[in-house]
């Protein structure tokens, strides 16, 4: 990944619109690296607390950020600390060190730090890296309850389950709640605008869906309402990103 980033540094962003990846709108060393560190922070946040969620995080929900912003430094210290822990504690804490290293390595190809891609931030890119938090939670639960994982014991009699079950329950409820947003395009795009109101794409997509609904309905009042909402959202999308070609069609 590092070699690919060095070789492709000058061409990785070629042809990628700012609507897809905000890094193409970053100018100079400070903005490029400040924004990269900002994205690392958001990916870490998704790992620890994946709520609220959106199907899209494009321009300008996540703004271009310079190195003068505190969040960039917080992210830098955080990730430097994670790397330091891996190298300094690997022999004494191999399980937790592996979990951290797994997260960092699995995120490397898609988090825009080394290689630009066509997504500013994507929850789907966390599918494999999220295994790291599962490993870390098992380790932490075992430490808190002084569980010896080498000893075989019935699962429900394991003290660590007292910690893990509530966590599993909470995240299961969050998953079920989030799944409701995926009922159809209208519900999904509505939730996208609610969570990411500053994304040109979420506004455009909901506007397009309202326009489609207006064409389908036979109710004149409802059609008028849908078209009015579509117009407002199209306007908002253009305000966020005037060069969004989709809204000019």
Where are the language model's segments positioned?
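Polytopic membrane enzymes that build or remodel cell-surface glycoconjugates and lipids
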Residues: 1-248
